[in-house]
């Protein structure tokens, strides 16, 4: 890891405008505080609604509302992130919307409030994700983005683990709605951390993955991205992965409630925390070794573990083995989370359409996640976990096969920032 840190410093100092320690730390801690606020309390929604007497089908519909909103928002959000210089302002808007959605969820498990809050939370996917990607790339450039992405995911995972524990404790020892008031409160330090990132250090051309001669504001067209066959194939693989993966943890939460575990919120927190601890340890390693050994070998590991995890969960409900499944989830999360940004950066180099491409991939993933949570909710309700998990394993295996057969190495021999 000392070697990785050395490579990161060397790459950073090679940039035209190296980012200050203040900006780097601000980005670190924004990732820490926003990670669980943006995605983690979404996992608690399934548990919260199940405790409130909602059926699996109703919960699936509620979760799908967030997925559909996220799907709609990501392409325009990515295009906006490419077009504007106000990257920090875009992130701030997303954080504020997330806080409002958390407060609405905490008020009452009323269908209209829950549905509206889920839509608001989903919309932030098209704002916060491209904003963080643009800020990161703008601060460090492509020559250091692998290690910066690993650092982003390390802080995000550590924040996810800690705040999931706090939110689980709030739900157990106060009341279930306290989970969401805790999530809303975490938006405040996220905004403070964002304020430490210096706007004058975010290089506009780098933030869009544009060349210096292509530094004008250009409207990215989705049609142009679909001419990039390798990007299309990678997007298809991530779509299949999300179709298999997105519903697994919410279903595990519902099953904990059905099994009538004492203090189920704490047990659910454990299942959320375990993969985040794994991601926190592995993400910098993934970033470093993706530079040393390339993206493809790590992608095959990340995608290949998902069908194994689904098969394991199909044949056991013992809590220790659920933890094993979540360790696998942490490995896949570290690999795919870090490498998705890197592969997109590789494949859009010089186009100025990096954030639009992130939005397109995110939209496809959002479609898959939305279909997964709604369809599997009814599937598990009708046939139970054993039958429900096996189709997910088959879909994950298909995603792995697509990477194996059609997605070659994307890492360039030399970077041009």
List the predicted regions and their residue ranges.
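A membrane-interface helix-boundary motif in multi-pass transporters
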Residues: 171-185, 378-396
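Structural signature of the two symmetry-related core transmembrane helices
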Residues: 89-103, 297-312
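Helix-loop boundary and gating motifs at the non-cytosolic
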Residues: 14-67, 232-233, 237, 242-256
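Interfacial helix-cap and linker-helix signal at transmembrane-aqueous boundaries
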Residues: 49-50, 80-81, 169-174, 256-257, ...
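Cytoplasmic helix-loop-helix junction between adjacent transmembrane helices
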Residues: 119-156, 343
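Paired small-residue
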Residues: 112-120, 320-329
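Juxtamembrane intracellular "pre-TM" segments in multi-pass secondary transporters
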Residues: 4-24, 201-234
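Helix-to-loop junctions at the C-terminal end of transmembrane segments
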Residues: 73-86, 282-294, 380
């Amino acid at each position: 890891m000392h070697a990785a840190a050395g490579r990161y410093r060397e790459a950073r100092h090679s940039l035209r405008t190296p980012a200050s320690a203040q900006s780097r730390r601000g980005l670190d801690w924004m990732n820490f505080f926003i990670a669980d606020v943006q995605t983690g309390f979404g996992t608690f929604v399934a548990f919260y609604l199940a405790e409130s007497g909602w059926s699996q089908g109703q919960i699936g519909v509620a979760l799908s509302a967030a997925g559909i909103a996220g799907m709609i928002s990501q392409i325009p959000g990515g295009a906006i992130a490419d077009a504007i210089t106000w990257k920090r302002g875009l992130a701030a808007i997303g954080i504020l919307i997330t806080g409002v959605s958390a407060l609405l969820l905490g008020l009452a498990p009323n269908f209209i409030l829950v549905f509206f809050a889920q839509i608001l939370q989903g919309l932030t996917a098209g704002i916060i994700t491209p904003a963080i990607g643009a800020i990161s790339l703008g601060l460090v450039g492509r020559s250091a983005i692998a290690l910066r992405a690993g650092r982003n995911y390390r802080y995000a995972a550590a924040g996810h683990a800690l705040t999931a524990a706090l939110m689980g404790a709030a739900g157990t020892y106060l009341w279930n709605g306290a989970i969401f008031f805790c999530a809303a409160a975490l938006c405040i330090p996220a905004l403070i951390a964002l304020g430490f990132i210096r706007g004058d250090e975010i290089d506009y051309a780098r933030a869009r993955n544009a060349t210096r001669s292509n530094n004008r504001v250009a409207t990215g067209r989705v049609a142009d991205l679909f001419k990039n066959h390798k990007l299309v194939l990678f997007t298809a693989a991530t779509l299949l992965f999300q179709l298999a993966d997105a519903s697994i943890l919410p279903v595990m939460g519902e099953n904990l409630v059905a099994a009538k575990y004492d203090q189920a919120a704490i047990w659910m927190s454990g299942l959320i925390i375990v993969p985040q601890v794994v991601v926190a340890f592995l993400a910098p390693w993934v970033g470093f070794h993706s530079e040393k050994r390339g993206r493809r070998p790590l992608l095959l590991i990340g995608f290949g573990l998902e069908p194994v995890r689904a098969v394991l969960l199909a044949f056991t409900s013992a809590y220790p083995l659920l933890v094993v499944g979540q360790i696998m989830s942490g490995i896949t999360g570290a690999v795919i989370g870090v490498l998705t940004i890197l592969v997109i950066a590789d494949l859009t180099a010089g186009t100025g359409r990096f954030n639009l491409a992130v939005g397109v991939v995110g939209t496809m993933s959002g479609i898959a996640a939305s279909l997964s949570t709604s369809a599997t909710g009814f599937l598990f309700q009708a046939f139970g976990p054993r039958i429900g998990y096996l189709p997910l394993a088959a879909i994950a295996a298909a995603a792995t096969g697509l990477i194996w057969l059609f997605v070659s190495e994307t890492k360039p021999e030399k970077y041009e920032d």
